[in-house]
Amino acid sequence: MVHPVQVGKRTRMSFGKVKDVTEMPNLIEVQLDSYQWFLREGLHEVFEDINPITNFTGNLVLEFVDYKLDMDNIKYSVEECKERDATYAAPLKVSVRLQNNETGEIKEQEVFMGDFPLMTEQGTFIINGAERVIVSQLVRSPGVYYNYSIDKTGKKLYSATVIPNRGAWLEYETDSNDIIYVRIDKTRKLPITILARAMGFGSDQELLDFFGEDERFRASIEKDNTKTREEGLLEIYKRLRPGEPPTVDSAISLIDSLFFDAKRYDLSRVGRYKFNKKLALNLRIANQIAAMDVINPSTGEIMVEKGQKISRLLAEDIQNAGIKSVDILVDDKLVRVISNNFVDITKQVPFDVSDLQIKELVHYPTLREILDNYSDETTIKEEIKKNLSRLIPKHIIKDDIFATISYELGLPYGIGYVDDIDHLGNRRLRSVGELLQNQFRIGLSRMERVVKERMTIQDQESITPQMLINIRPVAAAIKEFFGSSQLSQFMDQTNPLSELTHKRRLSALGPGGLSRERAGFEVRDVHHSHYGRMCPIETPEGPNIGLINSLATFARVNEYGFIETPYRIVDKENARATEEIRYFTADEEDQCLIAQAKEPLDENGYFVDKKVTVRYLEDVLVVPATDVDLMDVSARQIVSVATAMIPFLENDDASRALMGSNMQRQAVPLLKPQAPIVGTGIEFKAAVDSGVLPKARNAGVVTFVSANEIRVKRDSDGGTDNYRLLKFKRSNQSSCINQRPIVNKGEIVFKNQVLADGPSTDLGEIALGKNIRMGFITWEGYNYEDAMLISEELVREDVFTSMHIEEYECEARDTKLGPEEITRDIPNVSEDALKDIDDRGIIRIGAEVRSGDILVGKVTPKGETELTAEERLLRAIFGEKAREVRDTSLRVPHGEAGIIVDIKVFTRENGDELNPGVNELVRCYIVQKRKISVGDKMAGRHGNKGVISRILPEEDMPFLPDGRPLQICLNPLGVPSRMNIGQVLEVHLGWAASKLGWHISTPVFDGATENEIEECLEKAGYNANGKTVLYDGRTGEPFDNLVTVGIMYILKLAHLVDDKIHARSTGPYSLVTQQPLGGKAQFGGQRFGEMEVWALEAYGAAHTLQEILTVKSDDVVGRVKTYEAIVKGENIPEPGVPESFKVLIKELQALCLDVKVLNENHQEVSLKEYTDDEIADLEVNIEGSEESVPVVPVVESNIEEVEVEVEVEVETETEDGYREDLDEIEYDENFEIETLETDLELDDFNDEH
């Protein structure tokens, strides 16, 4: 039954029945742990891989001895980096040793290898002042994969692929004649026996003795035209290097370099682990019948007698005894199973080797050799350390190749199994650390080439490590990765949930991953191995669906990059769920029967029912309680954080739940956040881990609290911890970040306690929206098609008001004609326009600005015309005339307005780092308060979204019997067809809870039942069906039927009408067609497309049509004259010839067609072409005003809106449907690319939107 639960500072009434057996892990540990691994081990591995660099003669050796990140010399703190557009990084110092083998001289030096970006505590990076996130990538794990296809006759043809981390691929395939072929590195195929011969089995008999009798192998031998090892080698060489003269030596060295050279071929730790797991004997021979006695080679004892069935445990012992092959009987046929001969070292070595830190299996022949040659413990350990690269090879070895062939031969007999590439046991995660490591490796290998070249050129006596090493390639590789990799994304900072989700995102796209076009349905689909690892619900709609996923709540990533999920261990004999928790990867879980978290247990953990519902692979079975292996730890284990925040998720249709998860991430932080009355209990954990809340570093007592700062006196040593709060800072998405203290002076705080609320949080819980009194009722058609009718109260009381901070910057640069100047002295500007500008030429903080107002006064020198000799003489006599300047001030763009909250000025004199050519940089921050308005998009948490259609006076809204009016009316028709019934349950429970004064926690899949909701409604004194009489606010009459009324949690989404509305009178035109550009960012016109033209044609609106095709679009002269006529109030003149028609004629003439244009009297019309200068001279001359309007305004990225809508962009498509009008934009030489970056950033960061 319902019970109170303490969440931070708030008590919630919880309906959860399952008590969580384990804590949820830190939600951003996937980022933090991976980066820490990189600093600890990843860098070390890369330096080990590249060591030593020798020159071509081998007498100079360069080695990287040690490295350290110099944390004391970090230039700027995180906050300063954001202000100064700097990168948060620490210098990487590497000790390098150079040895001259001729003279024996050794030089050691510490070399600076560039600044290395550091991860903040929140799991992000600050790159050039912008907060970025590195998204983890899901890729296919290196290893060996078996598959089959079915040919025309219905026969299974098996194939295999050996995929390394980097290096040549090996592919096996069978044709319908049962011949097995191999492809080496995607070349033409050869019979597989050629590869086996080249690896050392020359004659046919040797092959058959080793691999055993097999028809497919015999068929391959017959197809093979080589008979000895040498012929096999030459045949492979001819295929791989056609046209070169083949010799046995060159063939051997070619194969060695392709497969057995650690620099060229890398399996990686994961690849080696997967190889050993797949090719080991134990899984292949378990439950099979032995054809011969199996004898332990080291002791001589018989482990399995002929004809005996091999149990699972016995199979493990055989594997670890170092037995290479076992013959088994399948339907009275003898099949030989060959392993790659790797064993568990602890089963072979008589003493404890845990201090050697060997976690993988080791190669048995190499280990045997060490054990046979040495006897005492210390020497054996020394030798094992020395031979680690042979014991655990990073490349493949011959034994691996033989074992893969043997596996291929065994598959038709049911020995082994084929792989499913979409199974999470075969897909792994590359997180930040590994992605960085790969980038760093690329940089180092480029550097290695430079070092080798310099070794040969420079004088060997005076050479030092510093002279050899060029750090440019390394720094460039890292910079390129953070700046432009598809996986380095501009952080989605709309609200704390979107930050958290972004850090937990898993993408299958990116370098080395899939591409959107190539990804089929199978990759995108939900797989049974996703359970508890990847959320089946949260993924974007659109082309990226299923390729971008989210980590489940309890999931974590293991050292190999596989995702694990926790389960409770079940004591099978007693059918009792223990308290022991173990993490399982997807392929470990596949052998188990797993009970649900909601399965009823008694107080000692015994299953109540004799029969239990369990999951096994993709099936749901009912089995006796004594057969259950594992049990889920929590009901929310299967979903991601955003999805776990939807109450009554189990009552929603999956596609609506998907929209609900995605829309919560778009909720704008409101002025006064309010935690949901009906929550799911995960809100607190999500807010704390997202990194927007300041937490106490140590336990202590609060000694001082203000809006900007909190001080805590530490218990441990009596010192003071200071916490600065962020006030009105701009986020990446222009929302407002503001922190407010929630502790009082004298309060005792414990370590990690939340001290202040951030954006969208309330008492430390995520609060994305507001609890609203609403009813499901139609009202005069204003709720048609999901629209929402809202009360004026929501506007007046600032319920859905949000703050938005925009940043504008202005640079003063050096131009060819002299430096630009930031000044108050601007030509042709009235004093009135400068009333808020200070003497520096910069607007004051607190000023209210509207579009077109000056923010920063700036003048740029104008080019002087060539002077005549007389003018130069006069100039020389009478002194210099003042040089001409033009006004290039920064103004508020169209459609923007607000209050200046902050100004930042950076100059060279103050020692600020600026881009080359920039002398001064000014940034202005404008804050807007946006109230809710018609056209804004709102949504609930269940995918129920809509646009506001009308704001009704409070007195006209339907009202309750106690006189309270509703705040929102939703359409009841939006519920049944969408099947998101969760919203109705939420409304009922919220109605009861608000009356009882409760905040509720109803966890997903474990929440309040219908009966419990009814009980709550009755307890609160309402009808058990949750309906009530509602009165019409205009007439006071009751509506005919009872209406469902209650409290729903509603979010205001980031799609605000103010950002979308747009109009233009004149503006920029496309260069070739002279038609207006499209889109708000380009300040474009409205497109009047093909179908719209048909509509006018259908009604015979000839004049309108002519106007749209000419003066409102690309009749260059006509549009100027028309503008003039409208302003002066005259009649619109006759239109001329559209520019795009001239372009068409020119294109036909370019095809050597002599096209002439004739008028109705068959006279030729001359099509005058305008040069750019003539177009520029066409200026609208409006009588009585000195201002003239240029025809071709320059594109400024900041322009947004004008009131009058005149111009129309006409559709012109070339044959292949490519839109010309976006082709070229008019620009002037001083237009800086940087200004466009604001528009581009979002696209970079978010492939998915």
UniProtKB/Swiss-Prot annotation:
Transmembrane parts of this sequence: none
Catalytic activity: RNA(n) + a ribonucleoside 5'-triphosphate = RNA(n+1) + diphosphate
E.C. number: 2.7.7.6
Keyword DNA damage: no
Residue ranges of coiled coil: none
Pfam family, one: RNA_pol_Rpb2_7
Any one biological process term the GO annotation gives: DNA-templated transcription
Tagged with keyword Transferase: yes
Signal sequence extent: none
Enzyme class of the recorded protein, top EC level: transferase
InterPro entries according to UniProt: DNA-dir_RNA_pol_bsu_external_1 (IPR019462), DNA-dir_RNA_pol_su2 (IPR015712), DNA-dir_RNAP_su2_dom (IPR007120), DNA-dir_RNAP_su2_hyb_sf (IPR037033), RNA_pol_bsu_bac (IPR010243), RNA_pol_bsu_CS (IPR007121), RNA_pol_bsu_protrusion (IPR007644), RNA_pol_Rpb2_2 (IPR007642)
Any single GO CC term annotated in Swiss-Prot or TrEMBL for this entry: DNA-directed RNA polymerase complex
Family recorded in the similarity comment: Belongs to the RNA polymerase beta chain family.
Assembly mode: The RNAP catalytic core consists of 2 alpha, 1 beta, 1 beta' and 1 omega subunit. When a sigma factor is associated with the core the holoenzyme is formed, which can initiate transcription.
Protein purpose: DNA-dependent RNA polymerase catalyzes the transcription of DNA into RNA using the four ribonucleoside triphosphates as substrates.
Annotated NCBIfam families: PRK00405.1 (NF001616), rpoB (TIGR02013)
UniProt-recorded name of the protein: DNA-directed RNA polymerase subunit beta
Lineage: Bacteria, Bacillati, Bacillota, Clostridia, Eubacteriales
Originating gene: rpoB
